[in-house]
Amino acid sequence: MKIYWLFLLLATIICFWNESSARITWNGTRYQRKAYWSQAIIFFAVVIFFCGLRSGIADTGTYIQMFKGYPSSISGMDLKSVNKDKGFFVISVLFKQFISNDFHGWLFLITLISGVALMIGLMRYSEYFGLSCYLLIASTMFTYFVNGMRQFIVVTIFFCATYMILEGKWTQYVILILLLSTIHGSALILLLVYFLRNVKPWGAKMRTVIFLSLIVGVCFDKLFPLFGNFLAETQYK
């Protein structure tokens, strides 16, 4: 709990600091508020440091046991025995062989990648960087650094690479999503996001998507068992 209050205090300071010193820059199409990199580095350095040095929060214990069970060298890898997330497995084995067998370093590296990707994404796309930092802590969304870290690293890298969607870089986007799907298979659903880039807000297509989403939400109790049966024989059973 003390760490949470520390994060919240830091986020509040960054928020006020950013509001009092934000720069107004021209990004080629419009004026945009921009934070200073020093603010971003200070905030995320603290968050990454404490989250990266954890050893027993949420599902961290499961990941630690998973890491300990991985082979310590490439020669010991058997990809045929890995049913899911082979990219994550390979990265972990490479870490054990070339960097360290200590899970602390492994957890810190994953936290570092997630944190840097999130920081870059917020610096690129957030008009109110300080407020974004505050909401990250106040809403407890920062806990994804320590719970569900495979999903979170996929989400943060995707967020950082949003420019591929905005600039229509289809080939690069597909390659990235396919690579991310080797870390967590659910990343494949992000391929659909690309096709929403040209959908006009509140246009016919967008209203259709919203309508279908509402139907799924209302019928969730009936659809969930069917979805569970569909996944019964997959890696997410």
Regions found by a protein language model. Give the residues of each.
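Transmembrane signal-anchor helices characteristic of membrane glycosylation enzymes that use polyprenol
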Residues: 1-4, 12-23, 30-58, 217-218
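Alpha-helical transmembrane segments and terminal signal-anchor/GPI-anchor hydrophobic tails
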Residues: 61-64, 89, 194-237
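Transmembrane-helix signature of polytopic, membrane-embedded enzymes
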Residues: 119-139
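Membrane-interface alpha helices of multi-pass inner-membrane proteins
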Residues: 141, 172-195
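Short acidic/glycine- and proline-prone juxtamembrane loop motifs at membrane-interface regions
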Residues: 146-152
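Membrane-interface transmembrane helices that cradle and orient dolichyl/undecaprenyl
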Residues: 158-172
